[in-house]
Amino acid sequence: MSKIDKPLDSWREELTEEQFHICRLGGTERAFSGEYHATKTPGIYHCTCCGTALFDSDAKYDSGSGWPSYFQPVDAEAVRELDDFSHGMHRIEVRCGRCDAHLGHVFPDGPRPTGLRYCINSASLKLVPRES
């Protein structure tokens, strides 16, 4: 997968204020406020910044957290995971594997088959519905 590396000013021009704050500055949307937290539409969730396929709706589940949650990405290269020591705790940050957009965090409290909960900001995603 070819990487995308753009200056922040370019991203600022292309994204909404909320998307820029979350994806490029590492922000977090309020729980239960995002467009996709309760969506059940079948499809693929893509990175809002670069269009890379990230998560399949087949891996989405209601974690009760208020953010879209998935038990796995579409493939291992779609996302990358980094240690995050912000806010006085240790978490694993999830970023887009292609453009390095901040997506959310992954926690070890998800359902089978992976036991993982990818807790993702709606503003970092764009759902492309499956054709019926």
From Swiss-Prot:
> Which controlled-vocabulary keywords does the entry list?
Metal-binding, Oxidoreductase, Zinc
Annotated residues that bind Zn(2+) are located at C47, C50, C96, C99
According to its UniProt record, which residues of this chain constitute the active site? C119
Q: What are the record's GO terms for cellular component?
A: cytoplasm
A single GO BP term for this record reads: cellular response to oxidative stress
- The MsrB domain sits at 8-130
Might you give the EC number(s) for this enzyme?
1.8.4.12
What family does this belong to? Belongs to the MsrB Met sulfoxide reductase family.
Q: What protein name is recorded for this chain?
A: Peptide methionine sulfoxide reductase MsrB
Q: Which organism is it from?
A: Pseudomonas aeruginosa (strain ATCC 15692 / DSM 22644 / CIP 104116 / JCM 14847 / LMG 12228 / 1C / PRS 101 / PAO1)
